[in-house]
Amino acid sequence: MKKISNQINNERLWERHESLANFGLCEDGGVNRQALSIDDLNARKQIVKWLEKTNIKVFTDDISNIFFRLEGIDKKSPPVLIGSHLDSQPSGGKYDGVFGVLAGIEIIQTLSEKKIIPE
């Protein structure tokens, strides 16, 4: 098994953190991106836009949850799930919730780019 932690694109990960922090940005540097607000929905659209530029399957459900999938070798094996939330508390920190989402995206995108196919 290849080690991918050293292959993560740290610059892309940081730029995406900064980009998402602009959705609902407050004067104090925090965010107010409450669930299903315009800022939350726009952040979700940005996530989908990033993923549509890859070979990763992207889909949403009826309540705007975003799912992305990189097919593995064995289609019967259970998936690995990584996630978090894009919305924030009314006075959340700049990165409230987004790290888990962005970490999952960066991992799956790195696997895809490096042509590492999970079992």
PLM features: residue spans?
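N-terminal hydrophobic or amphipathic helices/low-complexity stretches enriched
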Residues: M1-G29, E71
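General structural feature for long, well-ordered alpha-helical segments within catalytic domains
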Residues: N9-R16, D39, A43-I47, P78, ...
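Structural signal for hydrophobic packing residues in well-ordered secondary-structure cores
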Residues: H17, A21-G24, T54-N55, I108-K115
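A non-catalytic alpha/beta surface segment that caps or lines the substrate-entry region
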Residues: L25-E71
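Short acidic, glycine/proline-rich loop/turn micro-motifs
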Residues: V31, G92-K94
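Short coil/turn connectors at secondary-structure junctions
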Residues: T54, K75-V80, I117-E119
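Glycine/charged-rich beta-loop-alpha catalytic/anionic-binding loops adjacent to active sites
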Residues: P78-S91
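Alpha-helical metal-binding/catalytic segments enriched in His/Glu/Asp
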Residues: I82, K94-E119
